[in-house]
Amino acid sequence: MITTTDFGTLCDGRTVRLYTLKNDAIELSVTDYGSTLVRLLVPDKNGKLTDIVLGYDDLAGYVADDTCFGNNVGRSANRIGGASFTLNGTEYKLAANDGENNLHSGPDSYSKRIWDVAAKTDTSITFSLESPHMDQGFPGALTMSVTYEISDQNEEPALSITYEAAPDQDTLISMTHHSYYNLNGEGSGNILNHKVTLAADFFTPTDAASVPTGEITSVTGTVMDFRDGRYLGTDIEDSTLQTARGYDHNWVIGTGYGVPHKVLTATGDQSGISMDLSTDYPGIQLYTAN
């Protein structure tokens, strides 16, 4: 089922709403402010519902937030070096909001806008956003949507997040979902004892400003090798991670691009909650909230 409640009011008087979807195995709360995921509750090893994402209790927290808690980031996530890019022979200038670089498409973020509710059912909700030509500095008008859907097949809680984007000309589109997960439960401490298995043979190195260098490097023999499972805290102080102050890197998904398949498993050491992540994207960013 789905319920709707008021989540707060913006300074211009617009009302923001919170939508909660639940079934026997999972409970999800999302808001039309940024199409943001606010709460995600699943049962721990004792059957207790546990919120496994970080977030705020009210709208004011999200208005002030600059950490992208639960946001859908776009039009282009992560960093664009020099806050500019060239497409079809034309150079486009973006806002430099991370030193000389553009981060998460700049300060005029999709996460600070009210999205329309395009559709909803007992188990899903779709938000949509119209992004005009040259919005954030990107060419082309864009119709964007994100759908959250919950299920409990075989009594296992599941959440799917689906993006659809329809531009009217060539542009950059690289969306990501930016929830911060703590599988022991939000507020329970750090995630250094979370064990992560990541099916990726390569990663993309970054420079001193965390901008990708354009290289694709093997994970073999490095702290980036999660293929056989690794605790996040094992090498968190390694010298190769000091620029980013931890993990904040992109791993290359070498097979199955375009078809959803499991690429990552993470497990909380206290709760017994384990999360499988599947994607049809060619890359996955692992960030330890440095």
Question: Locations of the language-model features?
Answer:
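An exposed, glycine/acidic-rich loop-and-rim segment of catalytic or binding clefts
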Residues: M1-N290
